[in-house]
Amino acid sequence: MTKQQQVLTKLSILLVSVITASAPAINANIPVLAKAFPSVPLAQIELLTTIPSLFLLIAILLSNWVARKIGLKQTVLVGVAITVIAGLAPIMITSFPLLMLSRAAFGFGVGLFNSLLVSIISYFFQGSERSQTLGFQSTFEGLGGVLVTFIAGQLVRFNWHMSFWAYVITVPAFVMFALFVPRIPKAQPQQKTAQQSSHLPKAIFGYLILTFIVITFYMIMGIKVPTLMVSAGYGTATSASYVILALSLGAMLGGLLFGRLFTWLKDRILIVAFTALTLAMVAIAVSNATWLTVIGGFLTGIGARLFFPWVLNAVNLEGSGNTLATSLILIAYNLAGSLSPYTALLLQNSLHIASIQNLFWLNTLVFVILAVVFAFISWRRSANVAK
């Protein structure tokens, strides 16, 4: 490829990456949708924001099989085409079941290409350029969350249908990927995958459980903040979108800081991540103003983005089965996300949590415990090294 072709290929891949983090962009629509569908239980309304995660993980399980049949590029194009249709369909949909179906399809489309983008980057770029492109991918994911959330938050002022115009970004992503990313031979990337999938890290089950717990309480924050702000009387659907926007900005900053902080702190970065998440939950729990909740959202994004790359790095370091281990972590992530509305309801009912503020105090307790546990583990390791 010429230099110009390389730039266009890289830009096209990164533009598709923008879509991967855009599903939660309509979280701020929850209060508006609850009014639009008064006969639908709130837990089902909240499921609209997390049902993409469930179908995303189903698609992740199928994506490698589909890629072997039709090729990597074609699989990505099919996935992006699905997001174009499913992302924009709610502009015209008035039926709640069809709206739920469109969100499920959107998640499925993202899942088809989400785990394949790293393979595509690894195929076209080597060495430092590969590392740099992977870093850009993380940044573009965060940028996508910021951009789509901001646009959706402004458009929801008109009506909830209009907010889905934010997904028009999927159209240029499809066109550019189709035009500027060369076709990839089927055999080569799949041979690498087969070699990488033979072993799993010994601690994989621990990583899966930890991921499930952290992402469950992280997602509870995302789905409950809009309802909290409206019910507490200090926010609207639009102001709630600023919190989701701040979360995306925090995630971008966390992603940019991760490499440098990890080099310095190693596994102690988890203490920083869980401390940030603790402070975020406290800020939201005590808040009676949009600005403080926005700060909570920003800290949530930083903490989450410091945690998740750590998990992916850990499973890639300990085993040769990078692809399989990464897929399992993504499945745990998305399963936790898709179940989070019902997990929140279960926690509220079983622990007799009467208010949403108290649910955030429970989140605080969970992240405090995790911070203390990993601080203790770090201290024990340091003590053993000193001996």
Q: Can you say where each PLM-predicted feature lies in the sequence?
A:
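Conserved MFS/SLC helix-loop-helix module at the cytosolic interface between two early adjacent transmembrane helices
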Residues: 58-96
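Helix-to-loop junctions at the C-terminal end of transmembrane segments
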Residues: 59-72, 253-266, 348
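Cytoplasmic helix-loop-helix junction between adjacent transmembrane helices
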Residues: 96, 102-141
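Helix-loop-helix hairpin linking two adjacent transmembrane segments in secondary transporters
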Residues: 127-128, 132-182
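Extracytoplasmic gate region of multi-pass secondary transporters
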Residues: 203-245, 252
